[in-house]
Curated annotation (Swiss-Prot):
Subcellular location: Cytoplasm
Gene3D superfamilies for the chain: Aldolase class I (3.20.20.70)
CDD domains the record matches: HisF (cd04731)
Active site (record annotation): 11, 130
Keywords: Amino-acid biosynthesis, Cytoplasm, Histidine biosynthesis, Lyase
Gene: hisF
Membership in a protein family: Belongs to the HisA/HisF family.
Record HAMAP family: HisF (MF_01013)
InterPro entries, per the entry: Aldolase_TIM, His_biosynth, HisF, IGPS_HisA/HisF, RibuloseP-bd_barrel
UniProt name for this protein: Imidazole glycerol phosphate synthase subunit HisF
GO biological process: L-histidine biosynthetic process
EC number of the protein: 4.3.2.10
PANTHER family with a match to the protein in the record: IMIDAZOLE GLYCEROL PHOSPHATE SYNTHASE HISHF (PTHR21235:SF2), IMIDAZOLE GLYCEROL PHOSPHATE SYNTHASE SUBUNIT HISF/H IGP SYNTHASE SUBUNIT HISF/H (PTHR21235)
Length: 251
């Protein structure tokens, strides 16, 4: 049986890990390289590293931080933020990223997902979908959650799978930073539509939320930031808790 993954997320702004509520009121939660090492040593299955200002300000991801992080991290590292083309993906993989997360560019240039999955393999192409509920549907947002595309998130998820994405990182913008749990309706709708793994993101406040993301949202992996950054729970505590609930994890 496949093990469910626990993934701490490092949102980075100006070279520092930050965690805000709904992408706006950011608080400083430490140095990304040191945080990554703590998580790597602490049993994280993967680490997600997102430069949350890169797309908005149209600047390159901080390659040196990625490189230093990868040297201290001995678990798979997913890196995103400011990825605009195949060359950016190539640079990130060369800096030590195992997977590259693509958000804004996947909407603006869907063919880039086809090209990059052919060139590098679908296993290292993650499409990040930031979605917000509007009536009875969810819409895709880009540029760090600032621009509404009016694109249906469920349809977009299927299109990205068809284009060659190996995984989807699905963030509920309504839940991000709120600590009230994932939007499991959104997660379940996407996971029921595609045959590739989805990572649930946005809203974790306690360990039961991780359980719900897997059981109710049908996610293959659960991502969280605040509960790990501020020491509410360790990765090991999260794994032991999921294990106690009968959810297969790597202990």
């Amino acid at each position: 049986m496949l093990k469910n993954r626990i993934i701490p997320c490092l949102d980075v702004k100006n070279g520092r890990v930050v965690k805000g509520i709904n992408f706006v009121d950011l608080k400083d939660a430490g140095d990304p390289v040191e945080q990554a090492k703590i998580y790597s040593d602490g049993g994280a299955d993967e680490i997600c590293f997102l430069d949350i200002t890169a797309s908005k300000e149209n600047r390159d991801t901080i390659y040196d931080v990625v490189e230093r992080t990868s040297k201290k991290c001995f678990v798979p590292l997913t890196v995103g933020g400011g990825v605009r083309g195949v060359e950016d993906i190539n640079k990130l993989l060369n800096c030590g990223a195992d997977k590259v997360s693509i958000n804004t560019a996947a909407v603006q240039s869907p063919e880039m997902i086809i090209e990059s999955s052919k060139k590098f393999g679908s296993q290292c192409i993650v499409v990040a979908i930031d979605a917000k509920k509007n009536g009875d549907k969810w819409e895709v947002f880009t540029h760090g959650g600032r621009n509404n595309t009016n694109i249906d998130a469920i349809e977009f998820a299927k299109k990205m799978e068809d284009n060659g994405a190996g995984e989807l990182l699905v963030t509920s913008m309504d839940r991000d930073g709120t600590q009230i749990g994932y939007d499991n309706d959104l997660m379940f709708k996407i996971s029921s539509t595609v045959n590739i793994p989805i990572i649930a993101s946005g809203g974790v406040g306690n360990l039961d939320h991780l359980v719900d993301g897997i059981r109710l949202g049908n996610a293959s992996a659960v991502l969280a930031a605040s509960i790990f950054h501020y020491g509410t729970h360790s990765i090991n505590e999260a794994k032991q808790y999921l294990n106690s609930k009968g959810i297969p994890v790597r202990i």
